[in-house]
Design a protein with these regions (language model features):
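Bacterial N-terminal signal peptides
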Residues: 9-19
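Serine/threonine-rich, low-complexity intrinsically disordered segments
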Residues: 4, 19-21
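Bacterial N-terminal signal peptides that target proteins for export
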Residues: 2-10
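Residue-level hotspots at or immediately adjacent to binding/recognition sites across diverse folds
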Residues: 23-357
Length: 357
């Protein structure tokens, strides 16, 4: 057991206005309410549990938790200070799993059941394994994906969060040379709507690995996302096995000459309008609030896309690595220089009814 380093801070809020990039009758986008935490800290992982409880993780071996909607934060350190916690998956305000990334034994999974007061090491990867992203279902099943080694996938599964097992045979096809994921936001694996989904890159073809909740193996779908070294799928969002979104691109901003956001439905990929952000897209989420919205971010900012009106709204110019939501309104952003913020939505409009005199 490793004792945490905990301290609490009370933090002010600031509002940031948005920029509209198309004229339409789209509903009003959310505003960004910024909270400044440790100024030198880079936050990457986000796991909102409710409107009030949010966990974040980042470099320097640090995790933070707020239970009062971001007015104050408790900080903890699950392990050594040189670990980079690129992903965090919380169960509630007491229990959470934190994933650190890297090879040479740096890829680890820690668990707390007392709000970060203490952390236990639950899994340590071998020296040649580089884990990227983690997701946990409401039923407690977990999948962690890493970069392939030779002709083997490197994945870790837990049926309940207690025992973690390395698996190399969970995918219906072998990996391509150097195929793996990107640990930019913990968004390259996701569970949603009884569907497990993984996005890959750094290979000849960027692919989706996808299966239903009770599926035995992941099916493989080739995508039109830009591919090759430093390129591919960075974030995924499944509606079902036959309906999902992918975001990504190339780490070299000047090489992003292809669509970075795609929708797959009924066997067909459709490129969505390009967001007002430079460079590859690091994160992706979807909410339903006065219509359906896609949310994405990267080091050039964050943006919201209203699907019905096909309208982009630039939310921020900050260096934002991740944006994640819980439900239809509890959305949080995290990035460099201590950046933590939440989206504040205008109250949802009640559906109009026709009154017959």
């Amino acid at each position: 057991m490793i004792a945490s380093i905990a301290k609490k801070s009370m933090l002010p809020f600031a509002f940031v206005t948005t920029t509209v990039f198309a004229q339409s009758n789209a509903p009003e986008p959310p505003k960004v309410e910024v909270v400044t935490s440790i100024e030198s800290q880079q936050w990457i992982g986000i796991s909102p549990i409710s409107r009030n409880t949010i966990w974040v993780s980042g470099v320097d071996g640090r995790v933070a938790r707020s239970t009062d909607a971001g007015f104050s934060w408790d900080y903890s350190q699950p392990g050594p200070g040189d670990l980079q916690f690129r992903d965090i998956e919380a169960i509630d305000d007491r229990r959470a799993y934190a994933l650190s990334i890297g090879d040479n034994g740096q890829s680890r999974i820690y668990f707390t059941e007392n709000g970060g007061a203490d952390w236990r090491l639950r899994y340590g990867a071998s020296n040649d394994t580089f884990l990227n992203c983690m997701a946990i279902s409401p039923q407690g099943e977990a999948w962690v994906t890493g970069d392939s080694v030779g002709d083997e996938w490197r994945m870790v599964r837990s049926p309940s969060g207690r025992n973690w097992i390395k698996t190399n045979s969970a995918v219906s096809a072998k990996p391509q040379s150097n195929e793996g994921g990107f640990a930019s936001s913990g968004s390259c694996v996701r569970y949603h709507n009884d569907t497990w989904m993984i996005g890959t890159g750094n290979a000849d073809v960027a692919r989706v690995l996808i299966k239903a909740r009770f599926g035995i193996r992941f099916d493989v779908i080739e995508t039109p996302m830009q591919s090759g070294p430093g390129a591919g799928i960075f974030a995924v969002y499944p509606e079902s096995k036959d309906n999902f979104y992918i975001a990504g691109g190339h780490l070299q901003a000047e090489q992003n000459d292809q669509p970075r956001l795609w929708h797959y439905q009924s066997g067909k990929f459709t490129a969505l309008p390009e967001p007002p952000l430079d460079g590859t897209l690091y994160s992706l989420d979807k909410v339903d609030h006065n219509g359906e919205w896609l949310l994405t971010s990267n080091p050039s900012g964050a943006a919201a896309f209203h699907l019905q009106s096909k309208t982009w709204h630039k939310l921020s110019d900050a260096n934002i690595w991740n944006i994640q939501c819980h439900g239809d309104a509890a959305c949080w952003l995290a990035g460099k220089e201590g950046y933590i913020a939440k989206l504040v939505w205008k109250p949802a409009q009640a559906p109009q009814t026709n009154v017959v005199p």
